[in-house]
Regions:
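A short His-aromatic
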Residues: 116-120
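A structural helix-start
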Residues: 121-125, 145, 149
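A short glycine-rich, Lys/Arg-flanked "PGG" loop and its adjoining helix->strand segment in the class I
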Residues: 125-137
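Conserved N-terminal segment of class I S-adenosyl-L-methionine
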Residues: 1-105, 111, 115, 128, ...
């Protein structure tokens, strides 16, 4: 797939996508604030270091991290990178796909975020191996992707097609993939974007989104 032809300004404006057409930007503050609250406890022992957002889009997630960190972002979309730079002028951005050899040295990052990326890729396992290479031993990886269960299959089929979701993983498949690519699972859960903490608290597997916090081993 030619990702750069798919993820253009039209995709992020909602013309060629589903969730952006619903006003994704308006809900992003709540969504990314909730995500950061989950990640934040794992930053307590990382006073300084490098953070990478894989598939950073407009850079909303990087904005949540304190400036004491060196913040990096990659995305296949040149348009997205331009917008991310506006929101994060002190961060470093590169145009790159997660399935390609990532433009960073081995063992470079302390924390890597991969929010709603794997479902867009032809080979999510390759992307996780690439991420593993550039993450420091003991480094933290946060992954979020649609949970392909009965709820997702029946209620989100149109949305997934419109969003170009080509690799849909169940929650257990995501955990297995992380284990196979060299990560130790520290925590995992499923959730709904509108009821984030309900699913987080009760650890239900019926949420239509799946997430895991893992560590490089």
């Amino acid at each position: 797939m030619n990702y750069q032809k798919v993820y253009t300004k039209n995709y992020f404006s909602g013309r060629d996508s589903f969730f952006y057409s619903l006003g994704y930007g308006r809900f992003s503050t709540i969504f990314f604030n909730n995500q950061f609250k989950v990640i934040e406890p794992y930053l307590k022992n990382i006073k300084k270091g490098r953070i990478l957002d894989v598939g950073c889009a407009y850079g909303f997630m990087l904005q949540r991290f304190p400036d004491r960190y060196e913040k990096y972002g990659i995305d296949v979309s040149a348009h997205a990178i331009t917008e991310a730079k506006k929101r994060n002028p002190r961060s470093i951005f590169k145009i790159s796909g997660a399935e390609n050899k990532l433009p960073f040295p081995n063992n470079f990052f302390d924390v890597i975020i991969c929010n709603d990326v794997l479902e867009h890729l032809e080979n999510p396992g390759v992307a996780l191996k690439n991420i593993h290479r550039i993450l420091k031993p003991g480094g933290i990886l946060y992954v979020n992707t649609p949970n392909f269960n009965w709820l997702r299959k029946n209620l989100f089929a149109y949305a997934d097609k419109k969003e170009h979701h080509i690799s849909l993983l169940s929650h257990q498949t995501l955990l297995s993939l992380l284990n196979r690519t060299g990560f130790k699972i520290l925590d995992h859960y499923t959730f709904s974007n509108l009821t984030f903490f309900f699913f987080l608290i009760f650890r239900s597997n019926i949420g239509h989104e799946s997430a895991a916090i893992s560590q490089k081993i």
